[in-house]
């Protein structure tokens, strides 16, 4: 990490786990297995060492936000309106954002009594493939211009104001937005927004996505490790698609494995690596917390903004 991280405090895993009293994780091994991405690795020990202290830190931020809102209400001589606590989770493709987000959803719903927690991925704000084809940018899918950022900002604004919102659903199996299908996002105590682009600036740079976040997390790892995880995930998707002709990955099951590996590597190099280096990683220092993962997926270092 370079000088851009001078305003972060680096904390070892050993020190981090000591910042929260030891308690039993509020979920079972089976529940943890069911929420992790199928090529990710996480244990109940990780929950105890990393995520319970993180949930406690979020609790501190939430309490601070509520105190500030109350004080503002007194200053403005009006009752403060309840708003959801919005958490942004970013990082590269295949780094483990989804596992982190789903785990936080469970922990927050069980740490805060009767709390409602909604989880949204920004994949739903990708333009449909047909739109990308018409604009000549299908090969730029995942890059900033392939997202309907205006719709994402509008969603965040409505959620921030306690409204229920219906948003599009994206399927990784068909590699496209699912027509006529919507995710109904209800007004909640917490809303977790996960995606590679959640710290990026929209083309209208007068309004920043991060302005809507009360807390933000970047899941980080070495580039070589992420590439290995991506290629592993790609090949595992083939095994799931063998008997599903509707899957985007089905066509690859008909190809020699060498050609498939070469294709996946080319996609990583030309799209995912380029996107990471040019658009995703440069936003890393906008997070409140950076979780750094080692080669075996274990979080070994935590960076907390000073």
Curated annotation (Swiss-Prot):
Gene Ontology terms describing biological process: coenzyme A biosynthetic process
InterPro entries xrefs: P-loop_NTPase (IPR027417), PanK (IPR004566), PRK/URK (IPR006083)
Keyword annotations of the record: ATP-binding, Coenzyme A biosynthesis, Cytoplasm, Kinase, Nucleotide-binding, Transferase
Sites where the protein binds ATP: 91-98
Pathway named in the protein's UniProt entry: Cofactor biosynthesis; coenzyme A biosynthesis; CoA from (R)-pantothenate: step 1/5
Molecular functions (GO terms): ATP binding; pantothenate kinase activity
Subcellular location: Cytoplasm
Membrane-crossing residue ranges in chain numbering: none
Organism: Streptococcus pneumoniae serotype 2 (strain D39 / NCTC 7466)
Gene3D superfamilies in the cross-refs: P-loop containing nucleotide triphosphate hydrolases
EC number from the UniProt entry: 2.7.1.33
Official protein name in the record: Pantothenate kinase
Predominant location category: cytoplasm
Family to which the UniProt record says this protein belongs: Belongs to the prokaryotic pantothenate kinase family.
One GO CC term, this protein: cytoplasm
Catalytic activity: (R)-pantothenate + ATP = (R)-4'-phosphopantothenate + ADP + H(+)
């Amino acid at each position: 990490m370079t000088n851009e991280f001078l305003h972060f405090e680096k904390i070892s895993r050993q020190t981090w786990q000591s910042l929260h009293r030891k308690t039993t994780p509020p979920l079972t091994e089976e529940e943890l297995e069911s929420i992790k991405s199928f090529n990710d690795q996480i244990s109940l020990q990780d929950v105890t060492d990393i995520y319970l202290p993180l949930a406690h830190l979020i609790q501190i931020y939430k309490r601070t936000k509520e105190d500030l809102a109350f004080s503002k209400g007194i200053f403005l001589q009006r009752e403060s309106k309840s708003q959801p606590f919005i958490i942004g989770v970013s990082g590269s493709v295949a780094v483990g954002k989804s596992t982190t987000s789903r785990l936080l959803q469970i922990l927050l719903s069980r740490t805060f009594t009767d709390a409602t927690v909604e989880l949204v991925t920004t994949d739903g704000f990708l333009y449909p493939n047909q739109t990308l084809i018409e604009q000549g940018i299908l090969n730029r899918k995942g890059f900033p211009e392939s997202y309907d950022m205006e719709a994402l900002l509008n969603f965040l604004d409505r959620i921030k104001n306690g409204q229920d919102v219906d948003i599009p659903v994206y399927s990784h199996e068909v590699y496209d937005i699912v027509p006529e299908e919507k995710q109904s996002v209800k007004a909640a105590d917490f809303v977790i927004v996960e995606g590679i682009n959640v710290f990026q600036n929209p083309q209208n740079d007068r309004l920043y996505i991060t302005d809507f976040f009360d807390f933000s997390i970047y899941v980080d790892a070495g580039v070589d490790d992420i590439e290995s995880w991506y290629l592993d995930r790609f090949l595992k998707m083939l095994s799931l698609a063998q008997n599903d002709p509707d899957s985007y990955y089905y066509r690859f099951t008909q190809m020699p494995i060498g050609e498939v590996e070469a294709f996946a590597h080319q996609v990583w190099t030309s799209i995912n690596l380029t996107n990471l280096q040019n658009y995703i990683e440069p936003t890393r220092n906008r997070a409140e917390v950076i979780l750094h993962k080692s080669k075996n997926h274990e979080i070994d270092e935590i960076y907390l903004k000073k």
